From Swiss-Prot:
Keywords annotated in UniProt: Covalent protein-DNA linkage, DNA replication, Host nucleus, Virion
Function per UniProt: DNA terminal protein is linked to the 5'-ends of both strands of the genome through a phosphodiester bond between the beta-hydroxyl group of a threonine residue and the 5'-phosphate of the terminal deoxyadenylate. This protein is essential for DNA replication and is involved in the priming of DNA elongation.
Motif Nuclear localization signal location, chain numbering: 222-230
Coiled coil: none
Subcellular location: Host nucleus; Virion
Record-given protein name: Terminal protein
GO biological process, one term: DNA replication
Gene Ontology cellular component terms for the protein in this record: host cell nucleus; virion component
Length: 230
């Protein structure tokens, strides 16, 4: 069905206005063209092509520009939900096309992202405790009562952490200072692929550091709460 002159003008003006807005916000021409589906000049387009371009761009919703890159607001919200307080512009994929290939797009909403993170952290916590308990079982014959008591206290402290706090505990900014940077946890909640890699070479080092780190983590959380009340 052919567009009326008014419909044609509305669609062309919308596309042109969107392009100019992105330019004013600092997006590069290459990024804008990628966002516009490879289109640049909307004059002379057939009604069918114009309608398709209009529907496609409008369906992408609101946009945000970081640096000279274009992202949909929906993608940015999901990225912020995924990284939490660790979010920074550098965490975003570099460019609109890359963002469209991001794993975050498998989530339909911010709620789904948060639910996935919660489930991932919960499973990671359970698997981590299991690995520590297995290590404790294999080493308890040494007969060191003080070490065994400290070990149980450490596991108890981890158990009391919420799943989200455990996620911060395992991957937090201080983790590299206590050698957790080489402990990798990956959990895919769909059950198809679940992996836990616990490096034996780090076992003793982790034993020495986890108690210190958990205490530091609790201290940091208290300090953060006090700052929040001011």
């Amino acid at each position: 069905m052919a567009l009326t002159p008014k419909q044609r003008k509305v669609r062309r003006d919308y596309l042109t206005r969107k392009k100019r807005t992105l330019q004013q916000q600092g997006a590069s021409n290459a990024e804008i063209k990628a966002f516009m589906g490879g289109r640049w000049n909307f004059a002379g387009m057939s009604d069918k092509a114009l309608e398709r371009a209009y529907d496609e761009i409008k369906s992408k919703g609101r946009t945000q520009v970081f640096g000279n890159h274009v992202y949909t607001s929906d993608y940015v919200k999901k990225a912020k939900a995924w990284y939490g307080d660790k979010f920074s512009v550098e965490k975003l994929t570099q460019g609109f096309r890359s963002s469209q290939r991001s794993e975050l797009n498998r989530f339909h909403s911010v709620k789904e992202v948060k639910e996935y993170r919660s489930e991932r952290d919960r499973e990671a916590k359970e698997r981590y405790i299991q690995a520590l308990e297995e290590m404790h079982y294999n080493t308890r014959d040494a007969g060191n009562k003080a070490q065994e008591k400290a070990f149980k206290s450490m596991i108890s402290r981890i158990r009391r952490m919420s799943a989200s706090n455990f996620g911060a505990f395992l991957t937090g900014g201080r983790s590299d200072k206590v050698s957790f940077d080489n402990v990798m946890v990956f959990v895919d909640t769909d059950g198809k692929e679940t992996a836990f890699e616990f490096q034996d070479s780090l076992a003793r080092e982790i034993l020495d550091n986890v108690d210190k780190f958990s205490k530091q983590f609790v201290s940091d959380m208290r300090r953060r709460k006090k700052r929040g009340k001011k």
